[in-house]
């Protein structure tokens, strides 16, 4: 405990959801919200013996402002922060697994509209959900926080991430693939990574733009795959892939333009 209880704002309980912390920027989510979430995550990570925390963000316009305060909160909690910058969520989880600690926070609005942002959190190797997320709110409400002087370092994790994937995957033949990143975070690495797997890549909306000007970044909805289907047919591609805003959801289209829905993808992966 410390003597700062009167400084901690009352955060909206509605943003502490089942699988993440998420809100509308400027309404239920502000820069100071990010700071205090950093303080709570830092305290919890330290309590579980993990002083090292990795932080990344997606390409949303509110990202730089929020991530700066998140990192400051973690450092003020006494954590050592590895800032991996703009990355897709899978790269953040990879970094949390291979760098010094097993904790990480991804600042992302995922597949939600542009004015949303949020926090996906892993502490000591466990992705937080349900009561674990509520425990962070309880820490803030009871002022159960740590205080320290942590340090921040910038880490370029993508080369190591690419090396791991390319080393693990060998394709039986060269494929022509249309890659629709939906102007999300996957645009910084998905085309290059898939190309490194010996594919011919046709990029579509791969410039990171937090306004998502071409279509909503949710490949789970058929209306967001219209451009991908058209490009696959136009180019005679073998396959089409579409990613959501932070690159942890994928939509798949066959060479004929048919959508492979998630239940069938699950059977293929099994």
Model-derived segments and their meaning:
Residues 33, 37, 66, 88, ...:
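Catalytic-loop motifs flanking and including active-site residues across diverse enzymes
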Residues 105, 118-133, 248-270:
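Glycine-rich phosphate-binding loop of actin/hexokinase-like ATP-binding domains
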Residues 117-235:
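Gly/Ser/Thr-enriched, mixed-charge loops and adjacent short helices
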Residues 36-40, 91, 161-164, 224-227, ...:
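Well-ordered alpha-helical segments embedded in enzymatic catalytic cores
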Residues 2-23, 124-143, 242-244:
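Short, compositionally biased "basic patch" segments
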Residues 26-33, 58, 62, 66, ...:
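Catalytic cores of large soluble enzymes that bind and process phosphate-bearing ligands
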Residues 47, 52-116, 163, 193-253:
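N-terminal small/polar loop signature for handling phosphorylated ligands or for N-terminal nucleophile
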Residues 1-70, 76-77, 154-175:
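An N-terminal, well-structured beta->alpha segment
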């Amino acid at each position: 405990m410390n003597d700062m209880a009167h400084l901690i704002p009352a955060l909206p309980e509605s943003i502490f959801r089942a699988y993440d912390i998420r809100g509308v920027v400027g309404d239920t989510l502000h820069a100071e919200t990010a700071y205090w979430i950093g303080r709570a995550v830092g305290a919890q990570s330290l309590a579980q013996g993990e002083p090292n925390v990795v932080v990344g963000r997606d390409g949303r316009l509110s990202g730089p402002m929020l991530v700066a305060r998140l990192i400051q909160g973690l450092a003020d909690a006494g954590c050592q922060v590895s800032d991996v910058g703009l990355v897709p969520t899978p790269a953040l989880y990879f970094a949390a697994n291979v760098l010094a600690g097993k904790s990480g926070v991804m600042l992302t609005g995922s597949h939600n509209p542009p004015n949303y942002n949020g926090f996906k959190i892993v502490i000591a190797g466990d992705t937080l959900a349900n009561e674990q997320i509520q425990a962070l709110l309880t820490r803030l409400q009871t002022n159960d926080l740590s205080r320290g002087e942590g340090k921040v370092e910038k880490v370029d994790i993508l080369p190591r991430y690419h090396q791991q994937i390319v080393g693990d995957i060998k394709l039986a033949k060269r494929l022509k693939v249309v890659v629709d990143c939906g102007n999300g975070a996957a645009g910084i690495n998905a085309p290059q990574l898939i190309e490194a797997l010996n594919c011919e890549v046709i990029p579509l909306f791969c410039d990171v733009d937090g306004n998502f000007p071409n279509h909503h970044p949710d490949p789970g909805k058929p209306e967001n795959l219209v451009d991908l289907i058209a490009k696959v047919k136009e180019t005679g591609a073998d396959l089409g892939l579409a990613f959501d805003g932070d690159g942890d959801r994928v939509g798949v289209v066959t060479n004929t333009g048919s959508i492979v829905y998630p239940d069938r993808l699950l059977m293929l992966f099994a």
